[in-house]
Curated annotation (Swiss-Prot):
Note on domains (UniProt): Aquaporins contain two tandem repeats each containing three membrane-spanning domains and a pore-forming loop with the signature motif Asn-Pro-Ala (NPA).
Protein name: Aquaporin-9
Cited PANTHER family: AQUAPORIN OR AQUAGLYCEROPORIN RELATED, AQUAPORIN-9
Motif (NPA 1): 76-78
Family note: Belongs to the MIP/aquaporin (TC 1.A.8) family.
Gene: AQP9
Length: 281
């Protein structure tokens, strides 16, 4: 049976295989992440920092395990851009993976909503919910899908937070995926990335939610708009928020890639040269 399926279903086009692998990896990651966020909200643990750290780390770990050997399972458009800038993947693959990441995240948002539809209705946050009820933005519910800052946080503080978190994430990701560095074994790589995400999230998520991943924030935000949560999910703080967790991780990832390459990647002696995990064949 397995041989028959392998023969009949095998897809010759590498780009399609990578897209499907990355989309499924992202779907796994976001399903676990959003499902955990919903559980935290319904159980009154949305402000439990340790709970948030644990589901952030384990969600991305199992997402990487799904398609890591096929597409690389970077499952983060900002990190995907960073590794493309360093020449570790082609620009074509960068576009393929990024599209899969956004779409996989969007589909996961829809599935989690359907699974928790009855619970959302019971908590007054179902299909007829609007984010302003009455006239007060319900960040607690909208925050199931995407991140929102503390009310006191100024725009410049939010921008710096997102850039810095993404930069740290990129430092760590490039280091543990670099054969020339103290890279973990293949089977432990997803765990190392999960621990990295947990550490950065625990250190810097309090004021912004530390999305660090454009597809993690934008796709669920778009879904929450589509299901009727109101334009407030985008217009919050006079449209001065939604673009920060969407675009600033790209800036942080590019800075992180540049700094890592200048200070570490370009400084290996000739005898230490190797190949990156994400180098295209």
């Amino acid at each position: 049976m397995g041989a028959f399926v392998n023969t009949k279903v095998y897809i010759e086009n590498k780009n399609i295989r990578d897209w499907l692998s990355e989309a499924l990896s992202m779907f796994m990651y976001m399903s676990l992440l959003l499902g955990s966020a919903a559980t935290g909200h319904f159980s009154g643990r949305e402000d439990d920092a340790l709970f948030g750290v644990i589901f952030q780390g384990f969600s991305i770990t199992f997402g990487i395990y799904i398609g890591g050997a096929m597409s690389g399972a970077i499952i983060n458009p900002a990190l995907t851009l960073a590794v493309a800038l360093l020449g570790k993947i082609s620009w074509r693959k960068c576009i393929v993976l990024q599209s899969a990441q956004y779409i996989g995240s969007f589909i996961a948002s829809a599935v989690v909503y359907l699974i928790y539809n009855d619970s959302l209705d019971a908590f007054g946050a179902g299909a007829n919910f609007t984010a302003t009820e009455p006239g007060v933005f319900r960040k607690d519910v909208a925050g199931i899908w995407s991140t929102f800052p503390k009310t006191y946080l100024k725009e410049r503080g939010a921008i710096f937070n997102q850039i810095f978190c993404s930069m740290l994430l990129t430092f760590g990701f490039l280091a543990i995926s670099d054969y020339k560095n103290f890279r973990p074994s293949k089977g432990l790589f997803p765990i190392a990335v999960g621990l990295l995400v947990m550490t950065v999230f625990l250190a810097f998520s309090y004021s912004t939610g530390a999305a660090m991943n454009p597809a993690r924030d934008f796709s669920p935000r778009l879904w929450s708009l589509i299901i009727g949560y109101g334009i407030e999910v985008f217009s919050y703080n006079q449209y001065e928020w939604f673009w920060i967790p969407w675009l600033m991780p790209y800036v942080g990832a590019m800075l992180g890639a540049l700094i890592y390459q200048l200070l570490i990647g370009a400084q290996w002696s000739k005898g230490q040269k190797g190949e990156s995990k994400h180098k295209d064949p």
